[in-house]
Amino acid sequence: DEIGDAAKKLGDASYAFAKEVDCNNGIFLQAPGKFQPLEALKXIXKHXV
C-alpha cells in the first residue's frame, strides 16, 4: 500500500542519519525548557532555505 511504501522509503532514507545519533548523550535527559513555536519556526525556516 502507499503508506507502507512511503514508510519504507522514509526509513531507508533516514537510517544512516539515525545510526549517527548518540542516544546515550546526556542532552536527551535534559528538559527542553519552554517551547516557543515562533522561534522554532524561524529556526526551521532558516535551515530549510
Swiss-Prot record:
InterPro entries: Peridinin-chlorophyll-bd_prot, Peridinin-chlorophyll-bd_sf. SUPFAM superfamilies: Peridinin-chlorophyll protein. Keywords: Chlorophyll, Chloroplast, Chromophore, Light-harvesting polypeptide, Plastid. Signal peptide: none annotated. It holds the Pfam family PCP. It comes from the Eukaryota. GO terms for cellular component: chloroplast; light-harvesting complex. Its main location: plastid. Gene3D superfamilies: Peridinin-chlorophyll A binding. Monomer. This is Peridinin-chlorophyll a-binding protein. It comes from Alexandrium cohorticula (Dinoflagellate).
